[in-house]
Amino acid sequence: MLKGTMIKRNKMQLISTHPIKKSDLGFHANLFGGKLLAWLDASAAAFAMEVCDTPRMVTVKIDECIFKKSAKEGQMIKIYGKVESIGTTSLTLYMEARSHNVYSGRQSIILSTNITFVRID
């Protein structure tokens, strides 16, 4: 098993928050999907490093990504994650990106996926 801290496996944890700015928008004034995927991968990598107590973790696989809803300028994106499984050489995280309306406090899942990391020597 990978060396790591004792993180609750079934509890989603807030990892990062990103305000949506004009420069983050695509052609239809929605959050650009590539920007969201970059935030998701970077957040998951930081979480994997924390779980495994090492900065030597790299993304090896991102499962299917289905964009369920759009997000607009002025909303916040909150990225949550939890440990899905820990193997002898890999770690899989379940990740969610949620749009957060700062006025109402409502959140909607806009993307969820599993991301697998391995430790490099």
Residue positions per predicted region:
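HotDog/MaoC-like acyl-thioester-processing domains
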Residues: 4, 10-14, 72-73, 84-121
